[in-house]
């Protein structure tokens, strides 16, 4: 791909109840634009298989509409509850399937790497991640809910990878700013 061609990235924060997503376009001059963000919600009363189908269909629809070429997804974390980890793995599986079916370039990032990429520390709070997503994309307001901001952060992790050394001072300032606010 030539450097001047824009890349559309779909970032995903997976979950069985709420899956956050963010679609970011990166042009050849490294300008980043938020195209869309939001959440895919499933009904807790539905059987797991139906919820997974809804997640797959929601992600497939985003891919169909926006035609991203890159999928950046948060990797699984290890919860104390083994069932939670297994169920989250199922959600990730159907999301990865949708990306693979579309021929996307797939990148998986641990939660701490996503936090570090956008907020400067792997221990960043959801508020700090949300604040930096807003700053980095020059948004008027923070993406809501936080699951959507986390999806955008996943997309930014891929998009910012070559730029991370240059934005480190900005992230440090943002972490200090959010600490002052609380």
Name each region found by the language model.
Residues 1-182:
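Phosphate- and other anionic-substrate recognition elements at nucleic-acid/protein interfaces
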């Amino acid at each position: 791909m030539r450097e001047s061609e824009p890349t559309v990235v779909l970032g995903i924060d997976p979950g069985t109840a709420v899956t956050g997503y963010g679609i970011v376009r990166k042009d050849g001059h490294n300008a980043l634009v938020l195209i869309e963000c939001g959440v895919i919600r499933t009904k807790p009363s539905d059987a797991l298989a139906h919820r997974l189908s809804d997640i797959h269909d929601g992600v497939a629809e985003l891919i169909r509409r926006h035609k991203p070429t890159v999928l950046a997804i948060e990797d699984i974390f290890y919860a104390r509850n083994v069932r939670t980890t297994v169920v989250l793995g199922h959600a990730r599986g159907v999301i990865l399937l949708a990306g693979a079916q579309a021929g996307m370039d797939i990148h998986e990032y641990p939660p701490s790497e996503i936090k570090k990429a956008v907020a400067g520390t792997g221990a960043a709070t959801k508020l700090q991640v949300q604040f930096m997503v807003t700053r980095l994309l020059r948004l008027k307001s923070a993406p809501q809910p936080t699951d959507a901001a986390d999806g955008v952060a996943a997309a930014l992790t891929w998009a910012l990878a070559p730029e991370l050394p240059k934005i480190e001072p900005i992230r440090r300032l943002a972490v200090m700013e959010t600490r002052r606010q609380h």
